[in-house]
Design a protein with these regions (language model features):
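Conserved alpha-helix/loop element of class I SAM-dependent methyltransferases that forms part
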Residues: 30-49
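Class I SAM-dependent methyltransferase SAM/SAH-binding core
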Residues: 51-55, 59-110
Length: 238
């Protein structure tokens, strides 16, 4: 059940949800494989139970995947976008997910710091967070997640990694653009949207990623997935 007894189906726009699900698969190579492997990693790490923190829950893909095999898993899911929370709630209802789920519209600061979770996810979020020490920065988010995990608890996250200073950055970006078109994105949408998306991404390299994890109380990241620039990682609370 969700934290809101009010039915979410009236909020569920099937066309909008389908558009989002199609678009994310165009943008992220191997999107479904990423979630399948994340599920298997969690099964290996903590078994079929546990209390999960879903940071930046989006349309609810992680909730759908992680609840699939076990009704004993419970979740706290947050996202700063109320539209995404609405979509996630609707997905939970339409898929008849019976796990206990608490939704929050907001940031990591809306999750009580005295809660201690068995595991967390941060999927395709970090590359949109600025790399600074502000409350809107990567470090603040990672520290906030770390503070709410039990010692040794795993965090599985995925993000685009790249170094804008490398000579092959532009060719990597072009390959990504070609993938969007190959997967059926309208050329007009691609031309208008791609440059905007890339300009909004606070891309970092792997060295900087591990530096941020260390500062935030995590172990060095172990890579378990890669499709072009999209990487899947597991790290653990120290």
């Amino acid at each position: 059940m969700t934290s809101d007894d009010k039915p979410a189906t009236h909020l569920f726009d099937q066309k909008r949800a389908t558009y989002y699900e199609d678009r994310i698969r165009q943008v992220v190579p191997g999107y479904d494989a990423l979630h399948d492997l994340s599920l298997l990693m969690f099964n290996r790490e903590i078994g079929n139970a546990g209390h999960f923190l879903i940071a930046g829950c989006g349309s609810g893909s992680e909730l759908s995947s992680l609840s699939r095999q076990s009704p004993d898993r419970t979740f706290n899911a947050f996202d700063p976008s109320s539209d995404m929370i609405d979509m996630a709630r609707a997905r939970v209802e339409t898929e008849n997910i019976s796990n206990s789920i608490v939704f929050s519209t907001g940031t990591i600061d809306n999750i009580l710091s005295n809660q201690k979770f068995d595991a967390a996810t941060l999927m395709l979020v970090l590359h949109f967070i600025v790399d600074d020490e502000s409350t809107k920065g990567k470090t603040h988010l990672l520290r906030g997640i770390s503070d709410r995990l039990k010692p040794g608890a795993p965090l599985i996250f995925a993000e685009a990694l790249a170094d804008r200073a490398t000579p092959h950055f532009d060719s990597d970006m072009n390959l990504w653009r070609q993938h969007l078109l190959l997967k059926g994105m309208n050329p007009t949408d691609e031309a208008k949207g791609f440059k905007k998306i890339v300009s909004q991404m606070a891309l970092i390299n792997e060295d900087r990623l591990n530096e941020l994890l260390k500062q935030s109380g995590f172990t060095p990241a172990q890579n378990f997935y890669r499709a072009h620039m999209i990487h899947g990682w597991i790290t653990r609370k120290v």
